[in-house]
Amino acid sequence: VDYEWQPGYNTPAKLETDVFISYTDEHIYFGVKAYTDPNDIRGQVRPRDEMAMGLNEDIVFLRFDPYLDARSVYLLASNAYGSQSDIRAKQATSDEERYDSSFNAIYETISSINEDGYTVEFLIPFTSIPHPNAEDKIWGFNVTRYFTLEGNGVFTMSDKYDRDNPCRICQIEGRLIMNDVPFKRNTELLPYISSNLSGERASEGQPIEYGKSKNEFGIGIKYDINSASTAELTINPDFSQIEADETQIDINSAYALQYPELRPYFSRGMDLLNFLDGAFYSRTINSPSISSKITLQDKNSSSIILSAVDQKSPYLIGGEDKSYFGEGGISYINTYRHQRVVNQNTKYGFFTTNRFYEGGGSGNLFGIDGLFTFNKIWKIQFEFIKNFNVEPVANWIDSDDTFSNKTVELDGEKFNGHANYLRLIRKTENWESIIFYRDISANYRADLGFVPKNNRRWLTISQGYEKLLGNKYLQGYRINVKGDITNNINGDKKSRNLDIDLGITTIGATAINYNYDINFFRNYLGKDFRNVGKSTFLIISNPTKELSLLTRIVFGREIAFNEDDPEIGKESSVFFSMNYKVGNNLNINPSLRFSKLKKINKPGVFYDGYIARLSSRYQFNNDLSLRIISEYDDFNDKFYVQPLLEWNPNPSTIFYIGGNQNSSNIFNVDPEEFNPFLINRSQFFIKFQYLIGV
């Protein structure tokens, strides 16, 4: 690992790293020797994929490009304590679209820290990395190491890196050549059993009364069609999350909020269903009784077929100024996506999603998309989508609002719409220029997606400049200016917006960013607002190997979106999160979200509250942990605590036992008399799921 590519630019690596490679018919073996002062090593034993905030740990990434075309690059990583992380990357226009952390691969790591640094050993089954179906294999491969030196983060790599080529994963120059490796079909069974017991107080002052336990069992089956393609079937799957979502402040949001997908089933091959539009959002498959998935790959294409029967069907209606949400009953789901990969610079495809509701109603969506790269620095990306909908006749949504002379209320209306996206990007080492056009009709609806906003024609023009300096106290800086022009489909003016971003990276692995966002004009619910501007400061810092900090401060003018008569208020919001490592095993993560919108021309506030959260984890080893999460929501006077003991030796095998203890004002007690720390609802749960290779 000879080259430093950040902050240096293909300069000699400041620390030595040696890599040793071997393979058998079933596994690839890597040994990595990372030289450093052991007192400078950062990190601790942690759960899989929970990388420290701001990458505050010493870590080694192995990158594999089995098809040599950047369609799917697999990053398998380990920190100095043997704790794993795995990521799937693809050719894309931004880091947010490029990296998919939901990918899970089964591999083993062991590590040791010694007087001249640390070593990590990887044992990776061939079956964990989809690859061309041939006995003689040639894969793209390189190694990246990250460490902190003199207070600043440093990346070194086994390949040189051209900063004028924004496709980092297209620049994997190393080759793994492995001959006479036969394909060995892998079949996996994944049975589970689970039980949960819930109860609540029948009346104030009474003890919690528990009902009967709910016991579930199910099984998943995965069959390797070949070394790149699989078929999966899951019957009565348990798609529940064992860790509560971190509550977002939505008191002044006119649209539904999106939460990340945390369920392991939605990993293999699911990167094919990531779209600019949000046409597919896996959390809309809420409670399936059965689901199947087939992923197919060959030299020039990739495909996925996903089907499910959902017992509880979320229903989201996007709108011009706000969205509407309800929950329906049983629905039948199909999704198909095919992508043609010509080379690392050209890929295009088509897709369809279909949802049919029991009792009537359906949503069908069809689209084509593509990404083309020219002369390394130019990219053109497009998505053109058409939807055809028949509303169910149901009471899932209660609203008298209308769109395109149709009612939001679900009354069996038929309609169709479209969503078109076109993006042009030019990116070099220092400059980035973006033109992005979106055209979303008022009748557009994605029944398997997350599209809370429609009825808009939206043009974004952005120009940015970034410079890496490599100085101790100023690692780099960036400047970006972005303008937005938005009209509705009828041509009525909706917004005229300007964003200015300034950022620096400095000592202590600290990134400081300032954003000024001003709406020169904004129309909301037929009311015009002018010169509504606010500032945001964001600071992410790793000043020591034990401490990581994140602070976001927002102040300025904002619209009170959820008032019957919206008006301008004075906003002040703060988010603070700290991650502190105690020794090699204990991690403490408190956070606080505060938000207030004060009335300007009269006394009082539109809202004022906070959400406080504390997450503490003791990691006995890389597989076993005890975690306690507690959160108090001042906006809704709710408190919960969630203890969880978890054993997770690989992405699929898991045993956990835990509970949720909640308070909520279910007896309509006066807010002054309500005790938010008195538990009114209680749940205990246990689950065992074990991966069996056949």
Describe the function of each predicted region.
Residues 1-339, 360:
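Structural preference for beta-rich elements and adjacent junctions enriched in aromatics
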Residues 184, 296-299, 339-346, 470-475, ...:
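Glycine-rich phosphate/diphosphate-binding loops that line cofactor/substrate pockets in enzymes
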Residues 127-129, 355-356, 466-468, 631:
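Short beta-turn/strand-loop junction motif enriched in small, turn-promoting residues
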Residues 304-306, 348-353, 381:
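Hydrophobic core segments of beta-strands in well-ordered, beta-rich domains
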Residues 2-3, 33-37, 193-198, 308, ...:
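Generic short beta-strand segments
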Residues 287-289, 302, 363, 371-374, ...:
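Exposed, low-structure sequence patches enriched in small/polar residues
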Residues 182, 188-213, 263, 316-332, ...:
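Primarily recognizes Gram-negative and organellar outer-membrane beta-barrels
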Residues 367:
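Active-site-proximal loop/helix segments of hydrolase catalytic cores
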